Amino acid sequence: MTTKNKRVLQKCAYREEFKGDMERSTAATSKLPLEVELSRNSKGLIIILSSPSGTGKSSLAKALLKIDNNLRLSISATTRKPRLGEVEGINYYFKTGLEFEELVKQNKFLEYAKIYDNYYGTPKEYVEMLLNQGLDVLFDIDWQGARSIKKNATNVVTIFVLPPNIEVLEQRLRNRATDNEEAIKLRMQLAQNEISHANEYDYVVTNDDFDRTLKKIHAIIVAARDKAF
């Protein structure tokens, strides 16, 4: 991807405002220095995993949780409707728009944003509890959330997962058979925007082989623990 294209894609950032000014930003965390200080003094690591939709990030996250007993997944709050099989408090904390807005006003999120037509946010309290128990917390979030958290906490490791190439990514999305043509085009546009922010991450890994990629990411986490402690 050329530098010119990256600049164009960066202008296509898909953050949208919540009632005029409620977008993902560091403001949600910086207003509560005590909460941020707890993060800075916590015993665990924050591991952030980001990638475009269709790159295999969710599958990698599930596999990491299976092979590493010290990892816990950060559970996001969302305004979207539950999908078949999803359980409250396990997959997501499901909120109405008004409930989500109230949590934002109370500075209850480490980060939050609108993605597609729904809001997603990371509750502070649950993450703080895990970190202070000495557990490492795995975040499955986008570049905006990664940027916000990295600015407001220490012991943060950010990993971006790339597809082998754009053509493979598009084919994976089509193979899902869950989106129409318009949705696929939107996902591809957002994917290229995501990829343009990969250079902001500590590590960039290409998922061209699942098992090999899993080993690479786990090795990064283990090395980060050794460095931190």
Swiss-Prot record:
Origin superkingdom: Bacteria
Disulfide bonds: none
Name of the gene this protein is made from: gmk
Guanylate kinase-like domain segment(s): 44-222
Function (record text): Essential for recycling GMP and indirectly, cGMP.
Name of the protein this chain belongs to: Guanylate kinase
Record-linked Pfam families: Guanylate_kin
Binding site for ATP: S51, P52, S53, G54, T55, G56, K57, S58
Organism of origin: Rickettsia conorii (strain ATCC VR-613 / Malish 7)
UniProt entry tagged with the keyword Electron transport: no
UniProt keyword ATP-binding, yes or no: yes
PROSITE patterns in UniProt: GUANYLATE_KINASE_1, GUANYLATE_KINASE_2
